[in-house]
From Swiss-Prot:
Pfam families: ribosomal_L24 (PF17136). PROSITE patterns: RIBOSOMAL_L24 (PS01108). One of its GO terms (molecular function) is structural constituent of ribosome. GO terms for biological process: translation. CDD domains: KOW_RPL26. Keywords: Ribonucleoprotein, Ribosomal protein, RNA-binding, rRNA-binding. It comes from Serratia proteamaculans (strain 568). Belongs to the universal ribosomal protein uL24 family. SUPFAM superfamilies: Translation proteins SH3-like domain. SMART domains: KOW. The lineage of its organism: Bacteria, Pseudomonadati, Pseudomonadota, Gammaproteobacteria, Enterobacterales. GO terms for cellular component: ribonucleoprotein complex; ribosome. This is Large ribosomal subunit protein uL24. The gene is rplX. Part of the 50S ribosomal subunit.
Amino acid sequence: MAAKIRRDDEIIVLTGKDKGKRGKVKNVLSAGKVIVEGINLVKKHQKPVPALNQPGGIVEKEAAIQVSNIALFNAATGKADRVGFRFEDGKKVRFFKSNSETIK
């Protein structure tokens, strides 16, 4: 099955503490989760690693978010949009369902 959300897609968060925020997908994980730039930030306590010259402390990083809690952002309409698939010139492409515009 083809992925509706891919790396470098611009998304909008539908539910949770970051509802309404937009960001770019950094990584798509296999368990139906994605990591998005600047979304779902958590504080991680890291031990120092003297061998690698890394200091310890509290570090903020992005945690994974469920694919069901995000949607692709359609710049033409300015809203979240659903994704469909169709064939153009023998290739399977994604498109926005609201205005049938092909996703690059």
